[in-house]
């Protein structure tokens, strides 16, 4: 038989390690201003040197989109900032920007934020005739020497509804169904116990 004290230690250990599991995900919420000049479908970007200088995530008709980039974590590339353009956003909407990486890669994500690039402004070798929203972050290696030079990082752009990111909805639905199932299956027993007390 398991002793209650052992169960308490087991639960305490799990709660302690949850902080480490959460360490490989960083996220922020961003609300597009109501007067932000959105790109029209006929608008196009003009690039000074290379089309692929800035990666982008597009939400055209989707509630969630993601891309995988590879970040260089060698000592020459430390403190190098990654830029990703957020495309096809809607005014006055809130989005969650989530950066995830595998826990086997000892890295940290710092300075996760959004920036706005005004129209006709050259930025990282690109220029556009519309204002752009970019997410930026720095990848830092937590081990020396770096065990993996190129680390895959997944960046997700998720629409929020009622203040909740839509990727969490399936989990919430399952939890509500489980609780409802427990209530339905336990209700006759609880009602019977209450009637027996009277």
Curated annotation (Swiss-Prot):
Biological process annotations from GO: fungal-type cell wall organization; GPI anchor biosynthetic process; protein mannosylation
One of the record's GO molecular function terms: mannosyltransferase activity
Pathway: Glycolipid biosynthesis; glycosylphosphatidylinositol-anchor biosynthesis
Residue ranges, Cytoplasmic side: 185-198
Alphabetical UniProt keywords: Endoplasmic reticulum, Glycoprotein, Glycosyltransferase, GPI-anchor biosynthesis, Membrane, Signal, Transferase, Transmembrane, Transmembrane helix
Predominant subcellular localization, coarse grouping: endoplasmic reticulum
Glycosylation sites: 72, 80
Positions of transmembrane segments: 164-184
Topology Lumenal: residue spans: 24-163
Signal peptide: 1-23
A Pfam family that the UniProt record links to this protein: Pga1
Subcellular location: Endoplasmic reticulum membrane
InterPro entries, per database record: GPI_ManTrfase_II_coact_Pga1
GO cellular component labels: endoplasmic reticulum membrane; glycosylphosphatidylinositol-mannosyltransferase II complex; mannosyltransferase complex; nuclear envelope
Membrane topology value: Single-pass membrane protein
Assembly and oligomerization: Part of the GPI mannosyltransferase 2 complex composed of GPI18 and PGA1.
Function field: Essential component of the GPI mannosyltransferase 2 complex. Responsible for the transfer of the second mannose to the glycosylphosphatidylinositol during GPI precursor assembly.
Note: Present with 6940 molecules/cell in log phase SD medium.
Name by which UniProt lists this protein: GPI mannosyltransferase 2 subunit PGA1
Gene: PGA1
């Amino acid at each position: 038989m398991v002793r209650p004290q052992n169960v308490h230690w087991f639960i305490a250990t799990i709660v302690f390690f949850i902080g480490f599991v959460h360490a490989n995900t960083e996220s922020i919420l961003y609300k597009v201003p109501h007067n932000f000049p959105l790109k029209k479908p006929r608008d196009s970007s003009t690039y000074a040197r290379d089309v692929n200088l800035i990666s982008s995530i597009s939400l055209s008709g989707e509630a969630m989109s993601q891309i995988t980039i590879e970040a260089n974590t060698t000592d020459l590339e430390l403190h190098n900032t990654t830029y990703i353009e957020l495309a096809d956003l809607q005014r006055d909407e809130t989005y969650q920007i989530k950066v995830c990486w595998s826990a086997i890669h000892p890295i940290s994500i710092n300075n996760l934020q959004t920036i706005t690039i005004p129209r006709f402004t050259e930025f990282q070798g690109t220029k556009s005739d519309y204002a752009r929203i970019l997410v930026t972050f720095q990848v830092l290696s937590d081990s020396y020497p770096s065990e993996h030079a190129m680390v895959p990082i997944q960046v997700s752009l998720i629409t929020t509804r009622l203040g909740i990111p839509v990727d969490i909805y399936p989990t919430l639905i399952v939890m509500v169904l489980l609780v409802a199932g427990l209530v339905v299956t336990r209700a006759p027993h609880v009602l019977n116990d209450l009637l027996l007390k009277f």
